[in-house]
Amino acid sequence: MQAANPICCQYSGTLDFKPPSGVKDGGFVFQVNPGRSSPMSIKSLIRTIPDYPKKGIMFRDITTLFADADGLRDVIDSFAAEFQDKQIDVIVGIEARGFIIGPAVAVALGVGFVPIRKRGKLPAETIEVEYELEYGSDVIEMHTDAIKPGQRVLVMDDLIATGGTALAAIDLIEKAGGEVAGCAFIIDLPDIGGAQKIRDRGVNVFHLVEFDGD
């Protein structure tokens, strides 16, 4: 039996692609739709689980938000619209949920993504910062060659509460010679005060929704 001929498509014209404002040339980008989402629509997709991980805690579960295709797209669109004109060079995501939203927003802006991880999780040479917890301390690391001196860096995570890890990430980026252009979170818990601590460092904070009384 004779094999079927493959189907080919040819295009003889030229493609004239111009990236949206704030997006670097040559990057694959999402179409940014500013104003498409609202904080209330995003907030309604976040599930609240009481008494988790311990009694008295209201846990804000973003897995329901990420499971909704429109909701997830609204999150990425909202971040991209906010930062597309802020001359961001690279996005840094904090382990672990910063690894979910950070790369998607990086693609939307046409920039790279750098992970910040707990000690011992990165294979090459690292720099580190130790920071205080409620009981004890912890260490976060980043590859020494991940950020070039002078690069404008956007720090991303899912939620800002006490601000300890985000402040340590700022220290780590500045230690590497980067400039922290801002911090971005899906959720802010303003009563805990972490976002204000970051602002007190002179760093802008952007969030999509907030939950009071947590």
Residue ranges and their predicted role:
Residues 1-17, 23-214:
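PRPP-associated nucleotide enzymes
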